[in-house]
């Protein structure tokens, strides 16, 4: 299936194999829907954690689309973690802008408070503006009975991040070999206009350490999905 999706405000051309849709994505969504029916009066919160380059933002947007097409599924809403980046002014004051995207560049306390509001009822959620390169407050109105919070650090085995677990009903981790992610991330930067030399330097400084940290320091998820070199997804056996 070829489909145009709006991901973080940008139009993305995505493609998923029909076999993968039937054997991975639809069964996974029905499993999450079953979780939601256990306590339908309460919002179900799913964490999707993955290293950079695994296509998680596009994937969750595609899941939203699949849920809209299936009357047996509840409405699903994606809540990206990127809206909890510290503002550039804060990053500059702390000399952290070159490392934007690392755990230290996120406002974990703010994320924790927002997750508490998500569990309790209708609320808003910030979104990262990729033109301004800063968060926009109250950009999303959270209304769906099933939400998927996606980001790199949701399962980080670090004291500051452990409190997030109390708001999570089910967690999914997308795994892929670091070398595959390296090539995907460098290619993405080149497609954005950078030379290969600059793209490789960016990977070495920012994306590479983040990939390794997610792969090596994330806590065990309830479900692991593997991404292949071709960008396809399958359940681990």
From Swiss-Prot:
SUPFAM superfamilies: P-loop containing nucleoside triphosphate hydrolases (SSF52540). ATP binds at residues 50-57. Gene3D superfamilies: P-loop containing nucleotide triphosphate hydrolases (3.40.50.300). Keywords: ATP-binding, Kinase, Nucleotide-binding, Transferase. GO terms for molecular function: ATP binding; kinase activity. It comes from the Bacteria. PANTHER family: URIDINE KINASE. This is Uncharacterized protein YggC. The gene is yggC.
């Amino acid at each position: 299936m070829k489909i145009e999706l709006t991901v973080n405000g940008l139009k993305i051309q995505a493609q998923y194999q029909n076999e993968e849709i039937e054997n991975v994505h639809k069964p996974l969504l029905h499993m999450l829907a079953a979780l939601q029916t256990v306590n339908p009066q309460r919002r179900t919160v799913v964490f999707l954690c993955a290293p950079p380059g695994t296509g998680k933002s596009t994937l969750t947007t595609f899941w939203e689309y699949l849920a809209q097409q299936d009357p047996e599924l509840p409405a699903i809403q994606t809540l990206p973690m990127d809206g909890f980046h510290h503002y550039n002014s804060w990053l500059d004051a702390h000399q952290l802008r070159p490392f934007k995207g690392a755990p230290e560049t996120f406002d974990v306390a703010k994320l924790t408070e927002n997750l508490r509001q998500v569990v309790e009822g209708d609320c808003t959620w910030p979104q990262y503006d990729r033109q301004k390169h800063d968060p926009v407050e109250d950009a999303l109105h959270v209304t769906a009975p099933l939400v998927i919070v996606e980001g790199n650090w949701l399962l980080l085995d670090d004291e500051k991040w452990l409190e997030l677990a109390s708001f999570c009903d089910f967690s999914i981790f997308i795994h892929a070999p670091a070398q595959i992610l390296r090539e995907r991330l460098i290619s993405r930067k080149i497609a954005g206009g950078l030379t290969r030399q600059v793209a490789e330097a960016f990977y070495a400084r920012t994306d590479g350490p983040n990939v390794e940290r997610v792969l090596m320091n994330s806590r065990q998820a309830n479900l692991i999905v593997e991404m292949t070199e071709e960008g396809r997804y399958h359940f681990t056996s």
